[in-house]
Amino acid sequence: MALMRLGLRIPARLGSNLPVAQLGIRAAKHRFYATAPRNDGGELPSIKKLLMIGLAGTAVFVLAVNSLDKQQPKNSYSESEFESLQRLKRKVALFPGNQLKVYGVLGTEKYNKIVSGGKIVDPRKIIEKHRTTAGDRYEALLNILYDKYGAVEYFDMLPQGLMVKLVSLYMKDNCSEGDTVVILDFPKSIKDASQFETEVAGISKFIVSQKLKDTDICKYYDAVGKLESV
């Protein structure tokens, strides 16, 4: 401030010959402002890039939807899909197509009125053989059920699918293409019927006593035109 009152000048080597007061005024006139950084044209996203990003997002969305659709259980089929499914079932059966003529019999011994001859398959005898054969893989389980339910009732207490499995093993060793087969007292349930026809062979006729016509298994075979009552 003393320099300003005396009117002294700043030496030239310091960059100006103006009085200090005037230098302050001149400097105040030249203020600096912060400016936003300039964007070169190349840094801005082009329309092509935006379109590519949009298409990529759409593709991801479609894949996600398709993935969810595949996880949903399929509960309806077109006619061609249903036929393909049936062909697949026939291919995995032990005796696919019409290799065997199989008659199921339930609650009657008069089946010979409808079918004569043929190989007789008795599930009870098959199960008993497995139960009484030492070292058989099913011996222990069958004997547990036998001891718990008795010699008669234990046949009806087998785990779901076991009777079909044992009948299938027997037929694999004792039946061949072109045979007529009569299975006694089988099937007793729609589950057994469905499993047998999928895994072993189709049933041509289901022969039953008149008194059993109103049971679920009889209604099942009646609906497909395979029920015969005697």
From Swiss-Prot:
Q: How does it sit in the membrane?
A: Single-pass membrane protein
Cellular component terms per the entry's GO annotation:
mitochondrial membrane
Question: So what family is this one in?
Answer: Belongs to the AIM36 family.
**Chain ranges passing through the membrane:** 50-68
Keyword Magnesium tagged: no
What are the entry keywords? Answer: Membrane, Mitochondrion, Transit peptide, Transmembrane, Transmembrane helix
Question: Where do the coiled-coil regions begin and end?
Answer: none
What is the protein's name according to its record? Answer: Altered inheritance of mitochondria protein 36, mitochondrial
Its source organism is Candida glabrata (strain ATCC 2001 / BCRC 20586 / JCM 3761 / NBRC 0622 / NRRL Y-65 / CBS 138)
Main localisation, per the record? mitochondrion
Point out the transit peptide region.
Answer: 1-33
| Subcellular location(s) of the protein | Mitochondrion membrane
